Amino acid sequence: MVEISDDIQVLSHELHSSKLEYLGAIRGIRSWCKEFGERQKMEIDFKDDVSRLVPLEIGLCLFRILQEALHNAIKHSGVKRIEVEIAEHGNEVHLEIKDSGRGFDLEAVKRGSGLGLTSMRERARLVGGTLTLESKPMQGTSIHVRVPLKAKAGASAA
């Protein structure tokens, strides 16, 4: 029972975005990655190269995609190290998440009914961005998100 309570508390904390509001998008995401890595006993190699302020709605979009991707990696990849990079490229911000785990057959996932990939793509689309995925069995997975630094009007990725 205590374990369930702890899990609910962690989930509630993860769903709350006040850390992004308080620290700013990039620092908030970095802080969350550190905490998540410690909780999951895995190394998250976080790098960022963003000089501009990332609007909260874009930061929240990237944060939610990252959460889903890291939870999927924990569940399916079998790795203890994941690379996360957020970088500014012109008028876009890019998020890349890479692991060297089990990987999977993309066609099989497209035919499946899982909501994770669909929700990540939809979040990116809502702020005018795109999400691409590369994976092959036994060769790891790479997720690349590109979002314009100016979000679409009225967008919400929460």
Please give the residue ranges for each predicted region.
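Coiled-coil dimerization/phosphotransfer module
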Residues: 1-158
